[in-house]
Amino acid sequence: MRLLKSHPLLKLVNSYLIDASQPSNISYLWNFGSLLACCLIIQIVTGVTLAMHYSPNVLEAFNSIEHIMRDVNNGWLVRYLHSNTASAFFFLVYLHIGRGMYYGSYRAPRTLVWAIGTVILILMMATAFLGYVLPYGQMSLWGATVITNLISAIPWIGQDIVEFIWGGFSVNNATLNRFFALHFVLPFILAALVLMHLIALHDTAGSSNPLGVSGNYDRITFAPYYLFKDLITIFIFIYVLSSFVFFMPNVLGDSENYIMANPMQTPPAIVPEWYLLPFYAILRSIPNKLLGVIAMFSAILAIMLLPITDLGRSKGLQFRPLSKFAFWAFVVNFLILMKLGACHVESPFIELGQFSTIFYFSYFIFIVPVLSLIENTLVDLNYLK
């Protein structure tokens, strides 16, 4: 018997990456998983390397970043890899979620996979926010102040929780220390959740396919077919990431963060990283602080409603024209929210943000179930002819 199939550890690798049977018709849209695994590996390796040279102290944090950039051998490369791969990570995660929404990957028996994926997304956002604070530039300090202050919206105990998180009465040395500790440990928890995500997928029904039908009729092994298919997109990903790292490393960042944190001077606009902008826009669209915070967290958790609200008989939207149109309208609306999150809080951006927020929640609560029922009815009427 081959060692791959007899060794207690290697047979696990074999069952997941070599002999795992996959539907023969899955497209390149199913390659995001391997790309996201690459992103996580890059982030952990570069993150641990950066941690060796970083000083989590309000007096030294900004200077330690400059030390990494100027004095550490290839420190600039490690830092730019870390910051740009974070953007790539979120870009690919949004594509991964969009593919799952379009092809109905949240439907039974993969509901647990979808739920674990949602937890991974929330943890990613928390990790990214903590990491954005660490360079301790202007946007780091004021971003941390604004976002942590959201917790003060909780009645009675909110302000006490905020001061507990800060370790004082404002963002200070204790805050930076605990943010660094959490930012270091969360990616490893994320890696454990990714393994749970894979186990849940492997032990339920395996990968879905573009037709939304059972893939048991025609399956092929993961290696060498999909292994080489994944390698193609991995090489493309490395090429695109390299073009950002070497030629435009700061294009996705904020120039304000190259100014040392100054508690006495507020930046002209406090804006989070681009991948958090849609949820920031939803937060700002609601005048009430507590309701805005609830709406922001609900916007992330809203994707958990899809297994319940999608009542369509066919899996996925590829054969459902009304739902397909609504899905692409939702994608456009999400991009509009992303743009609005970077705009100043003034007319007409406030009104546009409120309209986009209403549409965002309407999609999950009303549009998906109503269109599902209409399409089911149209199928029934056609069948009765």
UniProtKB/Swiss-Prot annotation:
Cofactor(s) the protein requires to work: heme b
Cofactor comment: Binds 2 heme b groups non-covalently per subunit.
PANTHER family named in the record: CYTOCHROME B
Swiss-Prot/TrEMBL keywords: Electron transport, Heme, Iron, Membrane, Metal-binding, Mitochondrion, Mitochondrion inner membrane, Respiratory chain, Translocase, Transmembrane, Transmembrane helix, Transport, Ubiquinone
Mitochondrial intermembrane side: 52-74, 136-172, 248-288, 342-348
GO MF annotation: an example: ubiquinol-cytochrome-c reductase activity
Keyword Transport among record annotations: yes
Top-rank lineage group of the source organism: Eukaryota
Organism name: Neurospora crassa (strain ATCC 24698 / 74-OR23-1A / CBS 708.71 / DSM 1257 / FGSC 987)
Miscellaneous field: Heme 1 (or BL or b562) is low-potential and absorbs at about 562 nm, and heme 2 (or BH or b566) is high-potential and absorbs at about 566 nm.
Binding site for a ubiquinone: Y16, H202
EC code: 7.1.1.8
Primary gene name: cob
Subcellular location field: Mitochondrion inner membrane
Quaternary context: Component of the ubiquinol-cytochrome c oxidoreductase (cytochrome b-c1 complex, complex III, CIII), a multisubunit enzyme composed of 10 subunits. The complex is composed of 3 respiratory subunits cytochrome b (cob), cytochrome c1 (cyt-1) and Rieske protein (fes-1), 2 core protein subunits pep and ucr-1, and 5 low-molecular weight protein subunits qcr6, qcr7, qcr8, qcr9 and probably NCU16844/qcr10.
Role, per record: Component of the ubiquinol-cytochrome c oxidoreductase, a multisubunit transmembrane complex that is part of the mitochondrial electron transport chain which drives oxidative phosphorylation.
Binding positions for heme b b562 per the UniProt entry: H82, H183
Reaction it catalyzes: a quinol + 2 Fe(III)-[cytochrome c](out) = a quinone + 2 Fe(II)-[cytochrome c](out) + 2 H(+)(out)
Name under which the protein is recorded: Cytochrome b
